[in-house]
């Protein structure tokens, strides 16, 4: 019997029961891959939750980014309040990787800011995987990066049991050995203190205090304590304290690793000297010998992860352990959400990491073994996966092929294209929405006079909005310039309109979408509006300009995703402006019409009247916006020549904006710009710190 307890006031409806039954049957029959092809707004998460509950295995849910991972985690926690639903994403608030730019001879040291709360959640996830089966871990793709070996992590943990005879001094030494720090004045995560016969520990995986009471060398009681009030929350008969860090290296293994690092260093120095690269040899020897001395003296050094191959005893090229290895082999389930985005990310992680590190190795900043501190290659990751469910409204061909789907081939413009044949393989379709809302009608109109035609459609929605439920409009263009010109044209005609483009920061993007939902404006114009956060039930019209211009933004899957933006509204309509009907357009329209007919037939058979979706605005987004920026990008550029004149009250917000720009630069591999922004942030923080110290 499954240990998962799903709690909901709703029952599966529409074709959710059929989808749940299909997925569960396929998984229990032992099939490795299956796909849930669910249209927008059909309740895919609810279906997956029921599937997890019926299969009853520990589950890893992978999302393409932190935002969607957080959203999924919250939804699953509501559905499984009595089970362990954990959150595992990168614990860096900011991460500037170590890099070298040969063209300018610029070395940029690693710089990062670790979020302590997220680190706690990561430890909580691995602890749950060791101690229970009813676990769902929601993770971003960063979970395929190296993590400490689960065997060493578990072996290093310390068990405590009431009545156990144990030497206090040995316990304190063991705690220090697994990276806990003694601090008798202030308890915090990863610390412990001793007062007489009482040992208090704040573990890495939660914020409650573990109090162990001794009578001599015998454990008399184990209690969990509220860290603020000191109130006893519960008493336990036994528990296990896990290491404060995921990377744990026993002393004997550390000494062997040091010998191996020294041997590799000598080999690489000989290689550089033979090539006449004396500068690189000197640089490598100086840096590595310093790191070796730190490892001998304190067991740690900056950039220790670059020696992870030696510290974990792996062979050259062998994949590192990651979160997947904390699941028991062949006894867990993988769910890949938005698989059309997530699967390509898994493929791309290794190559980007390798290119940067290879430059460091070639120029003597790192030993070649640093290349093995890396994310998994795609083939390595999939080799670890026993069973998987792909989830998407537009799954990629690779996912469909793995799920046994059949394809038909079509030759277009000299290219041979493959297209999925509906109803084949282990592809479970879910097209009926619980609300009864059907896919939108799709109209194709000529480009001549398209702007005037669009204006008329917008006026129609504005008029209807004044008479009943609000309606909004999304317009997608091919270029940023076209989006700007169209926005200006609509503004001149009294339309409340904004546009989105790639240069808008994440915070400002959220702010614009929030204003859109609240009715601060009625029309949103943009180029790539396929990203998350645009599933707005108020959108009743999606207009696609230049729909016949083939390319990524007008490919079949992109068009279906855009059509889906109007699929949550009872009056949903899509207008494609085009002079020719491309293959992508024809297939997207045909697929939408196919789903629409299924939905209409279901509504007729069950006498269902479509109901509009009423969504509450997210308080989390609003509170996020409350600390949003006041200064625009031009102000930021001008801020530093007159930094001393910036009011102290505005510095925290300015730092926040610079951190966003710094993260964006690091993500785009613009290391020099990121380093400059980092230095600017340091100056501002020093000014704030100086002010606080003087007061």
Curated annotation (Swiss-Prot):
PROSITE patterns associated with the record: HELICASE_ATP_BIND_1 (PS51192), HELICASE_CTER (PS51194), UVR (PS50151)
Residues in coiled coil: none
Gene Ontology terms: biological process: nucleotide-excision repair; SOS response
Keyword match Protease: no
GO molecular function, one term: helicase activity
Residue sites binding ATP per the record: 38-45
Residues of the Helicase ATP-binding domain: 25-176
Keyword Ubl conjugation: no
Any single GO CC term annotated in Swiss-Prot or TrEMBL for this entry: cytoplasm
Cited SMART domains: DEXDc, HELICc
A Pfam family per the record: Helicase_C
CDD domains, A to Z: DEXHc_UvrB, SF2_C_UvrB
Positions of the Helicase C-terminal domain: 454-617
HAMAP family for the chain: UvrB
Function as written in the Swiss-Prot or TrEMBL entry: The UvrABC repair system catalyzes the recognition and processing of DNA lesions. A damage recognition complex composed of 2 UvrA and 2 UvrB subunits scans DNA for abnormalities. Upon binding of the UvrA(2)B(2) complex to a putative damaged site, the DNA wraps around one UvrB monomer. DNA wrap is dependent on ATP binding by UvrB and probably causes local melting of the DNA helix, facilitating insertion of UvrB beta-hairpin between the DNA strands. Then UvrB probes one DNA strand for the presence of a lesion.
Family membership: Belongs to the UvrB family.
Domain notes from UniProt: The beta-hairpin motif is involved in DNA binding.
Oligomer status and interactors: Forms a heterotetramer with UvrA during the search for lesions. Interacts with UvrC in an incision complex.
Protein name: UvrABC system protein B
